[in-house]
Amino acid sequence: MGIKRETILILDFGGQYTQLIARRIREANVYCEIVPYDISPEEIKKIDPKGIVLSGGPASVYVKNAPKCDKEIFELGYPVLGICYGVQLMTELLGGKVAPAPVREYGKTEVVINNTIPLFKGIERDTIVWMSHTDQIELPPPDFKVVASTENCPIAAIANVEKKLYGVQFHPEVSHTHRGTEIIRNFLFEVCDCSADWTMDSLIEQTVKEVRAKVGNHKAVCALSGGVDSAVAAVLVDRAIHDQLVCIFVDTGLLRTNEGDMVIETFRKNYDMNIIRVDAKDRFLSRLKGVTDPEEKRKIIGNVFIEVFKEEAMKIGDVKFLVQGTLYPDVIESGHGISSTIKSHHNVGGLPEDIGFELIEPLRMLFKDEVRQVGKELGIPDEILYRQPFPGPGLAVRIVGEVTEEKLEILRLADSIVQREMKRFGWYNKVWQSFAILPGIKSVGVMGDERTYGYAIILRVVDSMDGMTADWTKLPYEILESISTSITNEVPGVNRVLYDITSKPPATIEWE
């Protein structure tokens, strides 16, 4: 949002760990931004960063059309740290030589470092690092010294201490590198002389000022879903403009048991906010009648949501701004770096820009963990801050096939049992998501002395850091047994429970 502060720039060459680099820097209370690798020297000078990091990437620097930054970047006087592909590119551009490695290194590797240089200050001479490379430096650039080596990689790090140009072949941002955090902190504080001024307090204060200046005397609306992002965005903007903000909670009829009541009660109890609750259950269900295609269901839900939201906003009058809980990974994914992929997020709170309002996105430079930190500072209750992610289209994407009131009731009850048992066993906050799915298949069963023909419920529990990839959770058998027994005993019409043991990829977390 245009906040002027000490900044580290991360040039993105498509590495799988680029966002992890950013998180490690932010954890040190230093602000950073991920930018396209082809950013111009002029743009960099305008930003005037404290330092620059060149990320890893899948390419080889010596092949045609390999992504390369402008060589002039190394002449601007800013400290630079190249990581993996980044150090190879630095080598290539500054007159050294990179070639395929005779022995490719993957995984934990012992490295011997020169700990007299600022980058490795306080690090043991022998330490463990995470390697993942198929190329290596054969000859460092002129005026660079070799400052680390492994058994198979004689040039594992290089440095031009005078010009503050450093490069490492390993990945300090990955937790498997034993002293990786210290190496990154050394770059920030020993090399770049950062002052650790990135705090949630300062962010809140600055954002409040900027929102006030932008909104002026106009009104803003926010689609409140009860999720973490919309909640933090709403409370933050409410702190800035209070009476000028109206939050609209659209009850789609596709929510979990008592979810609408819980959200409204939580906000009204803790905050003096303008909240409008719209009951649009019948409208959503009637439009979904007979629809079985998952993408069609999503589109219908999104369109109806926009219709309802816009109608309510028009009733308020003089609304100029729309508050959205966009996060930094969304900004990166829809950006221009080579690792970018344009994704259609299924968050129905993500309204299109052409809805007729100017956007306010107070969280757009934050990662999820930082959003929760801001929420903590704002006093948002834990039951909101630590809720598991829930898809925008709600239970509609957890019912395979047509959505009906009967199926919604079955799924709500089954899902409430999953949440109850996960909390009872102390596992709710240990996993990324835990929920029930109604796949629309029926099977034969026996209850008492009678044959039954009932629905199956699928249990889905996954571990993840960010939802981009996920592993199925190895739940203890006693929890699985308790969930299964409770569902088949308490949910009418269900006689079987299955456990989905597929990771993402190849599957997605949600079924539709």
Swiss-Prot record:
Name of this protein? GMP synthase [glutamine-hydrolyzing]
Quote the SUPFAM superfamilies the UniProt record gives. Adenine nucleotide alpha hydrolases-like (SSF52402), Class I glutamine amidotransferase-like (SSF52317), GMP synthetase C-terminal dimerisation domain (SSF54810)
Checking CDD domains in the record gives: GATase1_GMP_Synthase, GMP_synthase_C
Q: Specify the pathway.
A: Purine metabolism; GMP biosynthesis; GMP from XMP (L-Gln route): step 1/1
Q: Which Pfam families did the record assign?
A: GATase, GMP_synt_C, NAD_synthase
Looking up HAMAP family in the UniProt record yields: GMP_synthase (MF_00344)
Assembly, in brief, is: Homodimer.
UniProt keyword Cell inner membrane present: no
Record carries keyword ATP-binding: yes
NCBIfam families assigned to the protein according to its UniProt record, in alphabetical order:
guaA_Cterm, guaA_Nterm, PRK00074.1
Function summary: Catalyzes the synthesis of GMP from XMP.
